[in-house]
Amino acid sequence: MYVETQEEEPEIKIPLPRVGITNLRTIAKINWKGRIYTFIPTFEVTIDLPREKKGIHMSRLVESITDAMSEAVEEEVKKIHTSLEELALAVIKRLEEKHKHKRAEVWIRTTLILEKTTPASRKLSYEPYDVEVAVIKEGKDVKKRLKVRVIGNTACPHAMANNNGKTHIQRAIGELEVMADFNEEIALEDMIEVVESSFSSPTYTLLKTPDENAVVRKMYENPKFVEDVAREILMKAREKFPGRIHVRVISNESIHKHDVIAEAWA
C-alpha cells in the first residue's frame, strides 16, 4: 500500500485556487469544420485545493490530458474534438472522473498556421499565429477565453504629415482576447482577421519583389498610430464577437529605443 500524502492535512490550512501542471507539451489533431489541423500544444491544467488537503494528485491531471489526447490523435476518432476549446473541455470532463474539485482550468497555447496569398504575385504563403485557448469550469458554469497574437506593421502619420510624405515604419504586434460563454462559436481565424486587417498592412512570410512593393505602398497609403490600430481592432471585435474583449497593441519603434503600447477593454 502506498501512503497518500496528498490526503493529509497541511500545517497551514489555507485554500489554494489554482494548483496543477504547466508547460506540458503534446500533440493533437483538431477537425474544425471538416479541415484537419495538427498542433503541438502546451498545456496548463489547474484545479482548486481545499484548505484541509495537503496537495493534489498531479498524475491524475496528466492522465486526463493523455486520455483526451488519445482521442485527438487517433485517426478513427479525430472528429470528436472539433476545436481547441472542445479539447480543453474534454480534459476537464476526464479530470472530473479522477479528482474531486470545484473549479478547473485548462489553458492551451499553440501556433496556428494559416494559408495566405501574397498581395501581388498571388503565391501561397504559410503564416504562423500564436493562439491561446482556455476553458474555466466552476460548478456548472463554463467559460472560455480565446486569444490571438498577430504581427503586422504601421507607418507613422505624424512624420508623414511633417516630412513631405516620408515616414518611419515598424513592426507592430496586435493581441485580441475574447472571454465568452463556452457555447458561443468564435473562430480563431476570424479573430486573426480582425487584428490583421487593422494594421497599416499585414506582414508575410513570403514576399517576392512585386509583393514587397505592394506592402510598402499599402503602408504609405494607410498610415496609422498604434492608437488607431487598437481602436480599429476594438471596434471590429465589438461588432463581431460576444462577451468581454481585451485589445493590446505594441509598436516596436524603429526610431526610438523604446516601444509604444495601446490597450483597451470592452
Curated annotation (Swiss-Prot):
It comes from the Archaea. One of its GO terms (molecular function) is iron ion binding. The record marks 156 as: May be catalytically important. Keywords: Hydrolase, Iron, Metal-binding. Pathway: Cofactor biosynthesis; 5,6,7,8-tetrahydromethanopterin biosynthesis. PANTHER family: GTP CYCLOHYDROLASE MPTA. Homodimer. This is GTP cyclohydrolase MptA. It comes from Pyrococcus abyssi (strain GE5 / Orsay). The lineage of its organism: Archaea, Methanobacteriati, Methanobacteriota, Thermococci, Thermococcales. The gene is mptA.
